[in-house]
Amino acid sequence: MCPALRHFPLHCPRNRSHNYLYRRQPGRQSRAGGGKEVYWLECPQNPTQPWTKRIITNSFVNYHDQLIGDVDDDGQIEVVTHSQGSKVLVYYKIPPDPTVQPWPDAYRRTVATDLSQVEGLAMADLDANGRTEIIGGPNIFTRPINPESLWGKVTLAGSYKKTRVAVGNIYGDGRPEIVLSEGENTSARLAWFTPPLWNAHVLNSTLFHPHSLAIADFDGDGLNDIFTGEMGLGTNLNPKLFVYRNKGDGSFEQVVISQGVPTHEAKVADIDGDGRPDIVGKTCDDQTNHVDIWFNETGK
């Protein structure tokens, strides 16, 4: 069954200077943002009141991506961030008092330095050895025994620049695969990579700035599909959103689920609680400044 999604526009202004990543704490929701600072906003008892800004770090410049999860397998969540301007990938352990500003350097761990044109972050135990890896752009970073050392790096697709990254089990064998889209190219590739040699399988090589990427089961058949969406940037007059429907044998059916609405950094979640993954996106460099929801109506 092909995925069927209904577009619902939400028109609203947005703050052009920040990107936000959301994380949940017991009873409250906080969010960490990028720019010259990485910070989290503490939710008050009444969430309609102003939230308190708490700086995590101001040591680097231009934080494109953030990720929150247990990256060092100690049972605690950490904050991972990549600084394009400073070309570093680091993570922060949460100090006993997370309201201290900025978080002390003693809680920072450096994963990699001298990284160029890297975008996109994900984490997963790729080789089932019980140790989490970080996928940063087209690179896999493996954690060293010595926590003070830089992580090992394996580049799986060096020609892919400024990518979006998604990780999930596509083959159905229980092992995660990696999906990359070249989010800042006008003739961009979308490809998935299979372990252990990370062979590339290109699904499309003519996309326009596919700066949205996710893995989810959109058609409810128990197989993970791949979503990507194109930007507009004032030159692409017919941007498209695609779901690549997983046929279960290593092949995919391309399904265009939307045309004419550009999107940037769209996310996948069940918005209306019906058990189906929906899509939420917003524009980039578009003066109309709109947020859009595509409700998944597959099977309805």
Give the role of each language-model region.
Residues 1-300:
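Beta-propeller-forming repeat regions
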